[in-house]
Amino acid sequence: MKRVGIIGGVLLAVLVVMQLVPKGRNHTNPPVTQEPAWPSPEVRALAVRACFDCHSNETKWPWYASVAPASWLVEHHVEEGRGELNFSEFDKPQRHAKDAAEEVREGEMPMAGYVALHGEAKLSEAEKQRLVEAFAAMFPR
């Protein structure tokens, strides 16, 4: 029993020390400079629900994005997502925009781990099809 207490104390100490590492706390949202031409407000709303937290400058940072080590993962995912496709910076080249329809069609996006934590991002089959069709028209290959 004493061993469990020692291990628990060490783990707690490690978690506390992890909070001192500044990585993962850059919760900034740069300005939106230009969005794509959305075919309808409905399509934009679907993209906001399923894509914008990682693929825009309008990220809604969840509480766990401030707690290491989850904060490190969240910041990494957002940085990576914005780097691949950023719906807030269409004044800059978005070379992966053409892949958006295929990613949604194949179930690669939104990521399963994200949907598990953000149920509102789960798309019905009809919503998924609508987003695929819109992305295919907006970002032709």
Annotate each language-model stretch with its function:
Residues 61-76:
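Acidic helix-start/capping segments at beta-turn-to-alpha-helix junctions
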Residues 1-4:
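Positively charged n-region of N-terminal signal peptides that target proteins for export
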Residues 26-47:
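Electrostatic cytochrome c docking/interface patches
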Residues 20-23, 139-141:
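Polytopic transmembrane helical bundles with strong interfacial aromatic enrichment
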Residues 72-118:
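Extracytoplasmic electron-transfer domains, predominantly the class I c-type cytochrome c fold
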Residues 6-22:
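Hydrophobic membrane-insertion alpha-helices, especially the h-region
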Residues 107-108, 115-141:
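C-terminal capping alpha-helices of c-type cytochrome domains
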Residues 47-59, 109, 131:
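The canonical Cys-X-X-Cys-His
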